[in-house]
Amino acid sequence: MNLSKFKRYPLTFGPSPITPLKRLSEHLGGKVELYAKREDCNSGLAFGGNKTRKLEYLVPEAIDGGYDTLVSIGGIQSNQTRQVAAVAAHLGMKCVLVQENWVNYSDALYDRVGNIEMSRIMGADVRLDSAGFDIGIRPSWEKAMADVEESGGKPFPIPAGCSEHPYGGLGFVRFADEVRQQEEELGFKFDYIVVCSVTGSTHAGMLVGFAADGRAQRVIGIDASAKPEKTRAQVLRIAQNTAKLVELGREITAEDVVLDTRYAYPEYGLPNDGTLEAIRLCARLEGVLTDPVYEGKSMHGMIDMVRNGEFPEGSKVLYAHLGGVPALNAYSFLFKDG
């Protein structure tokens, strides 16, 4: 596997830390050891997160190509767009963000706080759009790029989740390399890796990275899209492309994509009771915050799997904490009583 041939622009502090979730593990019976790799604190750029890791492999193209405006898209409380705005500010570029109405959640402050507030503070041109949720290429995003061109700018396209970019999966191939180095220091290997999966490139890159040591099917994606067949197909497609790019040396097949579909309901961006219980439990036992859209759902999945005995006794499970905490402010009503 060859990742070194790709240019990388450092945006993170270095390897994100791996920390034990001792109290959560004990609360769940102590038969499974839980750990977290903290992508939620991987960078000093506006709280960082998994997209910051991905952008390290997209930014060189933007710089080398003389682009002056980063153009991206997400929901109103998109973590992606906040991280793109931060990177644009860091690089001295302009930023245009399309924020679509992906979540059926009504709150007077939803489009004024959290991620979107930070993007505005960082100087991004934020454009609200009424279109609903989907994980594909969006007309509103294409229009934003055309607008930049018409005004004399040179737009660099960054799709939702970085996922449709050919290099969108590279950052999480590197994640797997980091984990292997950290495993040497820890003196053991993780039996399973749990990750939230929506637009696909985080899961796909991780799958390819761990396929290098035979653990592709030990990467358990927790669907949060509530459109699992679209997500599954996108993970597979991105993983196959990424495997070729890094010269993995073997084909990625549909059997390599493990996607648990039990925890996304009722729909994208809306938590269920299990999501909220997982958010509170992890916060109160570990002081680790997760959000209702992504990490609360993957945390719910991991907790439920431990409770159900789905991990063999003695397993060491790594939870990939991808970020997302700034969105909590937009859901403050749900937590008004704690």
Swiss-Prot record:
Keywords: Hydrolase, Pyridoxal phosphate. It holds the Pfam family PALP. The keyword Iron-sulfur does not apply. Its EC number is 3.5.99.7. It catalyses: 1-aminocyclopropane-1-carboxylate + H2O = 2-oxobutanoate + NH4(+). The active site is at 78 (nucleophile). The keyword Hydrolase applies. NCBIfam families: ACC_deam (TIGR01274). HAMAP family: ACC_deaminase. Belongs to the ACC deaminase/D-cysteine desulfhydrase family. This is 1-aminocyclopropane-1-carboxylate deaminase.
